[in-house]
Amino acid sequence: MHMNRINIRDMSLEEIESFISSLGKEKYRARQIMKWLYSQGAKSFDEMTTLSRAVRDQLNEMACITLPEIARVQQSSDGTRKILFRLQDNSFIESVLIPGKHNWTACISTQVGCHMGCRFCFTARQGFRRNLKPSEITGQLTMLQFYLPEGPEIKNIVMMGMGEPLANYRNTLKAIRIITSDYGLGFSTRKITLSTSGITPMIEQLGRDLCINLAISLNAPTDSIRSELMPVNRKYPLDRLLQACRNYPMPGRRMLTFEYILIDGVNSSPAHAEMLCRLLKGIRCKLNLIRFNEFPDCPFKTPSEETVLAFQQILVKHHYTAIIRASRGRDILAACGQLSGKALEEKL
């Protein structure tokens, strides 16, 4: 533990500039430090050889660099990899690397556990422990890049791991700004998708603060079904949620994504599909249809392939783009709704 020293990876460029100035050093040193942290992946100030020894000594005295530690990696038969990270306080989170034809997609977490209580989600079973710091969000990407030193790179980032990103808004926003900064990880905002259960005021705030891709975990065409599956809907019902979606800025040809987990006998009938079409009328969007991924002691079942295809065909008939998403990593509990760092934590 680094008691009383600030983790410099929790700081923005402006904060590092202020910090460096307080040490009597030139502000441009902050940009050098950012480059070392994110472009070079420096794990210590001693690696930052463009800084004088005196500056490095000062930084070592006042600050530290801490990153999540890879505790375990599991590989699925389809190539998906689930990474268990140990944090400084011995909490555990999970990230997922999903292989594409020419690159990787990184699915990262924003909280230790989750308090949203969605009934179809394994993460909800472990409860909520705490929010992740900016360094713990960006640190997942840095460590995943270390893990993939050669070959295809990480090109896309989805904030769909453990936790509700908009319930950890300030830290998530700060992390995204570091991820997209020229002095940070340098990702385009077009390559980042944030998934939310639907905290409506924060969707509106996100639209004012950033321009990233937004995915809504919808999962039901009516308030009664959605409130049963997702307690957040009792506070932010569908009419208010969809109004926020209609107002969300989508430059160019971007579209909102609605994620719809198909659960047998709950939300997957042809009548549900017809209601969904009416609900989303007028919103520029696409739908990701996801077969419910079963987990230990879950109360729900995966629908048949026939049910899934029939649901998709109704959406397509109404001119919606509806993609049936392959459930990657199901055999290692790395698929949608299956992450739970606690499950592996107890075995370490």
Curated annotation (Swiss-Prot):
CDD domains given in the database record: Radical_SAM (cd01335)
Active site, UniProt feature: E94 (proton acceptor), C336 (s-methylcysteine intermediate)
Domain of life: Bacteria
A single MF term (Gene Ontology): rRNA binding
Positions with a binding annotation for [4Fe-4S] cluster: C114, C118, C121
EC main group: transferase
Remarks, miscellaneous: Reaction proceeds by a ping-pong mechanism involving intermediate methylation of a conserved cysteine residue.
Protein name as it appears in the record: Dual-specificity RNA methyltransferase RlmN
Species annotation: Syntrophus aciditrophicus (strain SB)
